[in-house]
Regions:
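Transmembrane alpha-helices and adjacent helix-loop boundaries
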Residues: 2-397
């Protein structure tokens, strides 16, 4: 006969059953994070999205459209990672441009070396420096595979170091946001100040060939779009796995109450640092793919202003919903291009107004509005199908 305990004994940490596990360690995370059946994270939605995204190049009107959408898909990757940090972990990071820039510069350095014969320096080094051989910093980027690894590994490790330093000191909220923003500014200043190594404000340009393909060859933009689409699908799949895992529940519990998580025997600083590292890795991957898509890698692309815009994408789409982050990035950037083409001077005002309206009237973002509408329609259908007017389905059964 198995001994049992009441729910109160489990919740309040009563003495363990002889031979049983420690109740503090075994307290289910579901008590801290309510379970939900969220259609936005379903596998069916992922498969449908994958089919549409991968089929888009054949539907695009021209190659330029494919390149533009490839850029937006890279932004969506950043938004998904930021949603894990902010939406699920409660870490408002205003410096994701730092990790995006690290990935982009890593791939940009490789592409710069691809444009010149082996043993030859990039053109800007010959102009701004007296180097006679390739600097040590640039040598790992001669190989594509080492570049691909470093584009993800360097941002991840930097986020790990920064996260431990910050979260171990229990810095959070606006202080964490300001610190991450300051870190992004420092990164940009380093890029601008090292003219001999990074080409300063000019950035890395002149990518006429991309991984052996002519940049202006028909089909190159569609090929880059396919790479960006696969990258986004990988990021989404990983993100879904993370948020559904035990760690994902722990991350959400940390967001809601660090003290409770600490009582369960976990270190909130480690939990948050891992989430921050995941977001940085996704931003680094996005940057590595974005470099050939942009055709230029410049410090202005990774300053504090783009970092703030990344937060706007997640807020507009709906933080705490991965699909909302993707939707927000795509919708906001589509609106930017559309409005800027018609009224180039008005977009910044409209963007600010959009952000204010969302925060004031739709804090759940687009995804929250769609979810509430879906729930309202479901309830309406349930009432109409109920045999007794005003009775729910559960009461009718």
């Amino acid at each position: 006969m198995t001994a049992t305990r009441s729910p109160d004994e489990v919740q309040h940490g009563a003495a363990p059953v002889p031979g049983g596990p420690d109740p503090v360690r075994r307290t289910p995370l579901s008590r801290l994070v309510p379970s939900s059946t969220n259609p936005w994270t379903g596998r069916g939605a992922f498969v449908a999205f994958a089919v549409v995204v991968l089929a888009f190049p054949s539907l695009a009107g021209n190659s330029a459209d494919a390149r533009l959408w490839a850029e937006w898909l890279c932004y969506a990757m950043i938004a998904v990672g930021l949603d894990i940090a902010w939406g699920y972990g409660g870490m408002l990071a205003l410096g994701q441009g730092l990790f995006f820039g690290l990935g982009a510069y890593a791939m940009g350095m490789h592409l710069s070396l691809e444009q010149v014969p082996d043993g030859t320096l990039p053109s800007f080094m010959s102009l701004y420096s007296n180097y006679t051989e390739l600097p040590l910093l640039w040598r790992p980027f001669q190989s594509f595979w080492s570049t691909a690894v470093l584009a993800i590994l360097v941002p991840t490790l930097m986020a790990g170091v920064l996260g431990l330093l910050v979260f171990k000191r229990r810095i959070r909220g606006p202080f964490f946001a300001i610190l991450t923003q300051a870190t992004a500014v420092i990164f940009v200043l380093l890029l601008v100040g090292n003219l001999k190594l990074t080409s300063g404000t000019n950035g890395l340009t002149g990518f006429t060939t991309i991984f052996g393909r002519n940049k202006y060859q028909p089909g190159t933009n569609r090929w880059l779009y396919t790479v960006a689409a696969i990258g986004l699908l990988v990021v989404l799949a990983v993100a879904m796995k993370v948020v559904r895992s035990r760690y994902g529940k722990l991350l959400q519990a940390t967001r809601d109450s660090e003290d409770r998580v600490r009582f369960l025997g976990y270190d909130p600083a480690i939990v948050k640092t891992v989430g921050f590292m995941i977001a940085a890795a996704m931003a680094g991957l996005a940057g590595a793919i974005a470099a050939p898509v942009f055709g230029i890698v410049s410090p202005a692309q990774f300053d504090y202003v783009p970092s703030i815009l990344m937060v706007c994408w997640v807020a507009v789409g709906g933080r705490g919903t991965l699909w909302g982050a993707v939707l927000g990035a795509l919708v906001v950037n589509w609106a930017r291009v559309t409005v800027s083409a018609a009224r180039p001077d008005d977009w910044l005002y409209l963007q600010g107004l959009l952000f204010v309206v969302v925060l004031a009237f739709a804090p759940g973002g687009i995804a929250g509005l769609l979810r509430s509408r879906s729930q309202w329609l479901t309830a309406l259908v349930a009432r109409k199908r109920s045999p007794i007017e005003g009775t729910s389905l559960e009461g009718a059964v």
